[in-house]
Amino acid sequence: MPSQKSPTKRSPTKRSPQKGGKGAKRGGKAGKRRRGVAVKRRRRRRESYGIYIYKVLKQVHPDTGISSRAMSVMNSFVNDVFERIASEAGRLTTYNRRNTVSSREVQTAVRLLLPGELAKHAVSEGTKAVTKYTTSR
């Protein structure tokens, strides 16, 4: 009869959590201790275009609301368009052997990325915003 090893029960070994590894434990709400007193950790702020999207919505449709899911979609959309315009403007700056992204590059990027009438409206609104900013300074 072949000798079979019976499975031995192993007691779980206590390991100290490693910094940044899988076993690292997350700090609770109490956070760090200073002089024996628990100090609450401040939550990191989440940046969003939510308030601006809401303001524009109220300008266009004052009696309409927006769900948090729809707000999340709109926020993602604005972030995506911003990233596209910024990267295209950066590319144009590199092509023209410049170091600074100016309003001209941003305007050209908008013309390249947005179709027809939408680009015209975006350029006119952008120009209006830049003029308002320069006159207020």
From Swiss-Prot:
For this UniProt entry, what's an example GO CC term? Answer: nucleosome
Q: Where is this motif: SPKK motif 1?
A: 6-9
Matches recorded under SUPFAM superfamilies: Histone-fold (SSF47113)
Any matching Pfam family: Histone
Modification comment: Monoubiquitination of Lys-132 gives a specific tag for epigenetic transcriptional activation and is also prerequisite for histone H3 'Lys-4' and 'Lys-79' methylation.
> What domain of life?
Eukaryota
* PANTHER family for this protein: HISTONE H2B
Q: Which family does it belong to?
A: Belongs to the histone H2B family.
Q: Report what the protein is called.
A: Histone H2B.1, sperm
Species for this entry? Psammechinus miliaris
